[in-house]
Amino acid sequence: MKFLVVGAGGVGGYIGGRLSEKGNDVTFLVRQKRAEQLKKTGLVIHSEKGNVSFQPELISAGETGQFDVVIIASKAYSLGQVIEDVKPFIHQESVIIPFLNGYRHYEQLFAAFSKEQVLGGLCFIESALDNKGEIHHTSASHRFVFGEWNGERTERIRALEEAFSGVKAEVIISGHIEKDIWKKYLFIAAQAGITTLFQRPLGPILATEAGRHTAQTLIGEICTVLRKEGVPADPALEEESFRTMTSMSYHMKSSMLRDMENGQTTEGDHLHGFLIEKAKRLSLAAPVLETVYANLQMYEAEK
């Protein structure tokens, strides 16, 4: 089984590195600058779960080759170009596993490929590149979840399970992947929304009554949109999402807030813009969500 990992950053570099560490056939599709960096230093992972350092197999857009599994771990705003880049590497039986936040990317992938080729996927990990291009895994979690949309343990799922077996990461085959995706989407959109709106970590926000109320209102607005879309986002899910938020570190910053602090492009359109589009189409009022998105739009316009 030949793997193509699109992106060698905090997520793609990590899971691709773990697959390679086990002895799987893994190639990374990267841009020229990242390729030059990797050729010079190798792919390096610093993690309490075990460090990794090796010279990875690399390929660039425009080259030829066929791969059985394509793992997409790029930023959502790059997906249009990623789709064009990977098309030549995909054969009829290839399977695509995206590890992106949100849901909009599935609509793009289903339109570009057959839905049967795209598995549902998500991950829970805090990892990022330093200025030398080395990956630092800084969370206890390094969980990667994927599965068939109908929950079946198909032949290809069993083959993937074998390939991931023994990898130094928590890999879960889900029988309800769509539910898992929406659950994470709710939490990520709320966490990123509230921290970017107030430009603070979670702790100081949730330490105030007004901050807690705003966070709960945002979660409620997102759940209302999801319910109207047919997603089972009941009050128990709202409570669980807020409870998870309150259990996190006082100094916890969303990755989107860190992107803003570093002057980088955010996934605001992909996460919050997508929800706003649905709210408008459904004639739903979502004032906090709209304020979150307006703040992100102003940031993108000014950076």
From Swiss-Prot:
Binding-site residues, NADP(+): 7-12, 101, 267
Residues annotated as the enzyme's active site: 184
Molecular-function GO term, any one: 2-dehydropantoate 2-reductase activity
Keywords noted in UniProt: NADP, Oxidoreductase
Record's GO cellular component terms: cytoplasm
GO biological process: pantothenate biosynthetic process
Cytoplasm keyword on record: no
Assigned EC number: 1.1.1.-
Entry's family note: Belongs to the ketopantoate reductase family.
Protein name according to UniProt: Uncharacterized oxidoreductase YkpB
